Design a protein with these regions (language model features):
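Beta-strand/loop nucleic-acid-binding surfaces
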Residues: 3-12
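Short, hydrophobic/proline-enriched secondary-structure or compact coil segments at domain edges
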Residues: 1-2, 35
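Positively charged, helix-rich recognition surfaces that bind polyanionic ligands
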Residues: 15-295
């Protein structure tokens, strides 16, 4: 029996689009319909290759090689500084050029998922499951009520993060014809530490996985293609340790050093912004046929 169903559309189809495939998915008793459509899009050659930006993806923020227009749309940076300090105890340097940093809020979203209340309910659920197995009884109604609360918190946090990444990537794709990112190998970045600092490394691994670098890059990839623009991936080696001015590599630079200071030429800059400048330079040199290119 065929029956009409009410649904809420996220956005209209592109003009002259043909629906090729329909997919139905269910997540925690919520149903979603996705449409695969085919339509024509004019792809124009990049007019101004210098209108590019290098992005250094980090756990707390995305560093850009140049200022971002309409930066206030993407974040309230003062509120971000307050939230990070009060909730996580992380202090953000006020002297940094904030128009080159876009907070991801990934730590704040994961904080909601792993808050004390959330963990308490998870432990409660585990005890209920263990008790039902020992007594060979069915799980009661309270178990499913609590699980529904946990699912709602997890879904809300996940949707907030995805929505934020969509807003960031859409604004970047709208402003820049060329976007250069690092070709990050998250699997290698999140390998377990050997012998020393195992606990510290596990915390860093969790933060990296919560940030979802691949999701950001995949959003940028398809949006750049849709807009007829270009996304370039470059090797990530020594982007943070190399001086953008003279090219000297500071091998003594550690992860907790947030300010880059070149011992050769005296150049000083925020560590991630220096890395973003190097990433853009690498991308421009690749497009120029491995010829050294600088801004």
């Amino acid at each position: 029996m065929k029956m009409p169903l009410m649904m809420r559309m996220h956005r209209d189809f592109p003009p002259n689009a043909k629906v090729k495939q329909i997919g139905i998915s269910c997540s925690h008793r919520k149903y979603f319909v996705s449409f695969s459509v085919e339509y024509e899009q004019d792809i124009t050659i990049i007019k101004n290759p210098k209108n590019g930006v290098g992005l250094d993806l980090n756990v707390c923020d995305i560093a850009c090689s140049c200022d971002i227009n309409h930066h206030d749309k993407l974040t309230d940076f003062k509120q971000y500084q307050t939230d990070m300090k009060e909730l996580l105890g992380i202090e953000i340097d006020e002297e940094v050029n904030t128009k080159r940093l876009i907070p991801t809020y990934s730590k704040l979203h994961s904080f909601k998922k792993y808050s004390k209340e959330y963990k308490r309910l998870q432990r409660k659920q585990s005890r209920r499951v263990l008790k039902s197995k020992q007594n060979k009884t069915k799980l009661g109604g309270n178990f499913y009520k609590t699980q529904k609360k946990l699912n709602q918190v997890f879904d809300k946090s996940s949707h907030q993060k995805t929505d934020r990444y969509h807003k960031i990537t859409s604004e970047l794709s709208k402003q820049f014809e060329l976007i250069v990112v690092e070709d990050l190998q998250v699997k290698n970045m999140t390998k377990r530490a050997k012998l020393k600092n195992v606990k510290q490394k596990s915390g860093l691994n969790k933060a990296i996985l919560n940030t979802s670098f691949y999701q950001i890059i995949s959003f940028l990839d398809y949006k750049q293609q849709h807009n007829g623009k270009l996304l370039v991936k470059v090797p990530p080696q020594y982007t943070s340790k190399t001086c953008h001015c003279c090219g000297n590599i500071n091998h003594k630079l550690k992860l907790n050093h947030r300010q880059y200071w070149c011992l050769e030429c005296g150049y000083r800059e925020h560590r991630d912004i220096n890395a973003a400048n190097n990433i853009l330079s690498k991308g421009l040199s690749l497009r120029a046929g491995n010829v050294h290119a600088r801004l």
